[in-house]
A protein has these predicted regions:
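A general marker of short, structured functional hotspots
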Residues: 2, 43, 77, 90-91, ...
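Active-site rim elements
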Residues: 3-11, 85-92
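Short, contiguous alpha-helical
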Residues: 7-15, 19-22, 30-76, 119-158
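A generic structural signal for well-ordered alpha-helical segments enriched in polar/charged residues
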Residues: 19, 23, 27, 97-100, ...
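Alpha-helix C-capping/helix-to-loop hinge sites
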Residues: 28-31, 81
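Acidic/histidine-rich alpha-helical segments that form the ligand environment
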Residues: 78-116, 127-136
Length: 158
């Protein structure tokens, strides 16, 4: 791993975490997709994780943030059980969109940007990124637990 600057380390860790995310998503059996944990179906847990990553990694207060085409009001809220349903293709498409968005963002990021606040935002870029890594990996762990409880197998990780 190259450790030449903070943004290089953040970029590499993000690339690895995106790989882990793809791996976990690929390991979720179709039979588990609609099973509810804590009241929410597995796909909604995934959507929640992805939506928060999409909105919070860069700037949660961005007035130009656009909800994904599959979004319905409160779909990301795990306390509100949806009438809508997302299939694997819709989740995968959203994941690929986020992956591309983060790649562009990280390409433009420099160390001196990390302690700056994005426009209209309370927190620094560094705080937002670390907070998302915490939240993101909490949900990856939950998803891995769902898979392991169902299959007895643990998804492979880096």
């Amino acid at each position: 791993m190259r450790e030449t600057s903070y943004h290089v380390v953040i970029t590499e860790m993000t690339v690895r975490a995106l790989w882990e995310t793809q791996n976990v998503l690929d390991c979720i059996p179709d039979a588990l997709w609609d099973i509810r944990f804590g009241g929410a179906p597995v796909w909604q847990h995934i959507y929640h994780m992805l939506h928060e990553l999409d909105q919070w990694f860069i700037n949660p207060d961005d007035p130009d943030f656009v909800e994904p085409p599959v979004h319905h009001p409160h779909l990301q809220n795990l306390s509100i059980y949806p009438a809508a349903h997302l299939d694997r293709r819709q989740i995968d498409d959203y994941f690929y969109t986020i992956k591309a968005k983060l790649s562009l963002y990280l390409t433009s990021l420099h160390d001196e940007d990390l302690l700056q606040r994005p426009e209209n935002c309370t927190w620094t870029r560094f705080t937002l990124i670390l907070a998302q890594f915490r939240h993101w990996h909490l949900h990856l762990g939950m998803l891995m637990g769902f898979v392991q409880a169902d299959t007895g197998l643990c998804p492979r990780t880096l």
